[in-house]
């Protein structure tokens, strides 16, 4: 049985690095992998890129008003065994349900990588839907500069923490 899996964490917790490693491992074993990210995510253009500048090309840039089941994406999905979704916090609940359907009705392994919350501690809508629909949830952690496990994203302007915006 295939699952919808979520890897989530704060900024710099290694979410995209995990995606890139998963991509490498699945492809090494001969699996057909599709990489997707929301169109709204401008970092890296049509690639997923981590903080050490490792990258992989994106197969689908998915707009918020699009469905993964749109006719233009069906040929790409056909024969796919694994879908990796970067920056999944920007997806809509409808899109999360579609990825759940791909896993449970079509038999494609779907793995999403997402920020848990914004700098105010509020869950992103895509992450909230994933927490509800994902079969497996895995937190990735990173140490804060204070040495403890980071639990929030910080927002800084000109070197100072800000709490508005």
Regions found by a protein language model. Name each.
Residues 77-91:
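Conserved P-loop NTPase "ATPase switch" module shared by AAA+ and STAND
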Residues 73-76, 81, 151-153:
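Hydrophobic transmembrane alpha-helix bundles
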Residues 4-6, 32-34, 81-84, 109-111:
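Residue-level preference for the first positions of well-ordered beta-strands
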Residues 29-31, 78-79, 134-135:
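Short glycine/proline-enriched coil/turn segments at helix->beta-strand junctions
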Residues 1-74, 118-129, 139-142:
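Conserved P-loop
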Residues 19, 86, 134:
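Residue-level signature of catalytic and energy-coupling elements of molecular machines
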């Amino acid at each position: 049985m295939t699952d919808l899996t979520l890897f989530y964490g704060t900024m710099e917790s290694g979410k995209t690095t995990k995606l890139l490693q998963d991509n490498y491992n699945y492809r090494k074993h001969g699996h057909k992998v599709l990489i997707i990210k929301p169109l709204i995510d401008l970092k890296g253009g049509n690639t997923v890129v981590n903080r050490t500048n490792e990258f992989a090309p994106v197969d689908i840039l998915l707009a918020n008003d699009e469905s993964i089941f749109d006719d233009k994406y069906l040929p790409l999905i056909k024969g796919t065994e694994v879908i990796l979704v970067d920056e999944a916090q920007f997806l809509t609940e409808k899109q999360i349900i579609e990825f759940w359907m791909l896993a449970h009705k079509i038999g494609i392994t779907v793995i999403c990588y997402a920020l848990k919350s914004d700098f105010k501690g509020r869950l992103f809508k895509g992450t909230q839907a994933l927490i509800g629909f994902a079969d497996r949830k895995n937190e990735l952690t990173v140490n804060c500069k204070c040495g403890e496990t980071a639990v929030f994203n910080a927002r800084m302007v000109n070197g100072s923490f800000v709490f508005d915006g």
